Every structure is written in structure tokens, then in C-alpha cells.
Amino acid sequence: MLGKIVTIAAVAAGGMILSKQLRKSRESGKATIEESIEVNVPVSAAYNQWTQFEEFPNFMKNICEVRQLDDTHLHWRAEIAGKEEEWDAEITEQIPDERIAWHSTSGAEHAGVVTFHKISDSTTRIMLQMDYSPKGFIEGLGDAVGAVKLQVRTDLQGFKDFLEAHGSETGGWRGSVARH
């Protein structure tokens, strides 16, 4: 009997937390994710690989395609919540070995920054912050239960595994984009 009461209480508490998260997401319209990972490569290798956007489908499960249109514009195609989505993004700042910032210009509304921090000559901490606006009930629910945060964490782990397995970056763009 006590076990049933504890289970019912846990389900009720979980429902209250989920309801609160859904309400918070709906009220603000925005959600923020912050994740980091340490990669066993020099900072230049981590940064260079991150600039190879067209390689993202190799380690980001939901990304189907990324086309780099020019130095600052990308077209993305992904599967989100079981349906295909497309959007364009603009790189708003790029400093070699330090940071890359972006925002969407069409489709799913989001913006973010990824930064690269030298831990040692052979270890880099990658920190990602992304703000986005979940669309509709399914994406809002995914946000509320932490599915998007888990996907970002999985994608960062995929990047780490991809880069460490290759031993070095597959290319790199060392140009800068002034903040705008």
C-alpha cells in the first residue's frame, strides 16, 4: 500500500513539474539550453572541425543536411519531433579558436553561441548556449521534458566521438566574422 501511495505521489509531482515547465515555456515563448563537453584535441582542431558545418549530419542524429551558402549563411534540414524542418541561419560572429555565434533568419526561431576553451594543449572545453522558441504542443512538450537538452548533449557527445575517432579535424575555416 505504501508503495502505491509513493508511486501516486511521484506521478502527481512529476505532473506538476511538467505542467509548470509547459506553462513557463508558453509564457516566455523562449527556452535556453546550456551544455558543455571536453574534447581530447587542441582548441584549434575543435574549432576547425566545428566550422565544417556540412559535416554535422555525421555526428548530429537529427540533422539531415547543412549547406554552407557563403561565409556567413547556412541552410539546414533536420527532423524535429518526427517531421522535416528547414531553416536558414546567419553567422553573426566568428573568432578563430574562440567563438561562433548565429541566429536563424527563417524557419525555426533560434540563436546561439559556441565557445572553445583551452584546458590543456590537448584538451578543449566546448560550451554551447542556444535560445529557441518551441513551436506547437509537441515541441513545447519536448522542451518541458528535457528532450531538446538531451539531444544537444547527445550531439556534443557525437561531435567529441567523431573528432577523437578521426584524430584531427576534417578541414577548417580560419576567417573572422565581425560581430553584427
Describe each region flagged by the PLM.
Residues 78-82, 104-106:
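Short acidic, glycine-rich loop/turn motifs
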